[in-house]
From Swiss-Prot:
It comes from Xenopus laevis (African clawed frog). The active site is at residue 72. Methylation by PRMT6 stimulates the polymerase activity by enhancing DNA binding and processivity. This is DNA polymerase beta. The gene is polb. Belongs to the DNA polymerase type-X family. Residues 183-192 are annotated as: DNA-binding. Its main location: nucleus. Disulfide bonds: none annotated. Mg(2+) 1 binds at residues 190, 192.
Length: 334
């Protein structure tokens, strides 16, 4: 998951901006994930509202906007600012911790530890690089590039390289670029790829070579430039498009997950998102007597105990089982 905020094309950009800022404060400083989720949900719903919101009362009609958020919207619309945010921005602890978490590899706990040691800025991090782990050093090295959104045109170029290399390695591989890119977004925070192969199922032994040989192939062609984490089923790293005569492309974050073939399409559905769409689909599945997660779809018995995973060979199979009309990825940005 990227730490960059998506650009807004909403008539309510000011409202969504302050909600996202409050969300990040609750997650990074207060560690209040429930408040983070509430602010993010409200921001997502308001971002899709087609007209300019004129009052908190109007906003409260939207699912996910409660009385407290509506009050903040009224304050923002009346004054152009929010007292709570002004206070947060003036607080050295809050602003420093929020900033440090923008470095990939630095979570809220590490950010607070660095802050307690007097490390508050990028220069402070550079002067204390011996305290950083490998992941954090790479995050610091490429901080400016990782802050930039990835235009869809660049995502398409990277997708072409990845799919071509994977297919040449073994045509039985299946790879899908997920996230907001698959939903048609004009920009993305990072490259999130799901990978599978018929040799790897939930019943078989682990097959780390299936992931590692793909990573090696992408390293050999100089597309993957750095490794952050490489396990049996997940790779986290850095990639870069080949430089052109008039352009050096930024370094980008890339994640590749190897998923058992029989769980692949539940994974594709989940990692395509959006978060709200996934929650709505899980709720609908429960109403129809199924439990759905990123791994499987299982029928629920009369006692509420889940049965064996159902066979799934496409995303559409999942929609069909739970009797929900299929929605293309571009129609899942709720």
């Amino acid at each position: 998951m990227s730490k960059r905020k998506a650009p807004q094309e909403s008539p309510n950009e000011g409202i969504t901006d302050f909600l996202v800022e409050l969300a990040n404060y609750e997650r990074n400083v207060n560690r209040a994930i429930h408040k983070y989720n509430a602010y993010r949900k409200a921001a997502s719903v308001i971002a899709k509202y087609p007209t300019k919101i004129k009052s908190g009362t109007e906003a409260k009609k939207l699912d996910g906007v409660g009385a407290k958020i509506a009050e903040k919207i009224d304050e923002f619309l009346a004054t152009g600012k929010l007292r709570k945010l002004e206070k947060i921005r003036q607080d050295d602890t809050s602003s420093s911790i929020n900033f440090l978490t923008r470095v990939t590899g630095i979570g809220p706990a590490a950010a607070r530890k660095f802050f307690d040691e007097g490390i508050k800025t990028l220069d402070d991090l550079r002067n204390n690089e011996h305290k950083l782990n490998h992941h954090q050093k790479i995050g610091l090295k490429h901080f400016d590039d990782f802050e930039k959104r990835i235009p869809r045109k660049e995502m398409l170029q990277m997708q072409e390289i990845i799919l071509d290399k994977v297919n040449n390695l073994d045509p039985e591989y299946i790879a899908t670029v997920c996230g907001s890119f698959r939903r048609g977004a004009e920009s993305s925070g990072d490259m999130d790829i799901l990978l599978t192969h018929p040799d790897f199922t939930s019943e078989s032994a682990k097959q780390p070579r299936l992931l590692h040989q793909v990573v090696q192939c992408l390293e050999d062609c100089n597309f993957i430039t750095d490794t952050l984490v490489k396990g049996d089923t997940k790779f986290m790293g850095v990639c870069q498009l080949p430089c052109e005569s008039d352009q050096d492309y930024p370094y980008r974050r890339i994640d590749i997950r190897l998923i058992p073939k029989d769980q692949y399409y539940c994974g594709v559905l989940y990692f395509t998102g959006s978060d709200i769409f996934n929650k709505n689909m899980r709720t609908h599945a429960l109403e129809k007597g199924f439990t759905l997660n990123e791994y499987t779809l299982r029928p629920l018995g009369v006692t509420g105990i889940a049965g064996e995973p159902l066979p799934i060979d496409s995303e559409k199979d999942i929609f069909d089982y739970i009797q929900w009309k299929y929605r293309e990825p571009k129609d899942r940005s709720e």
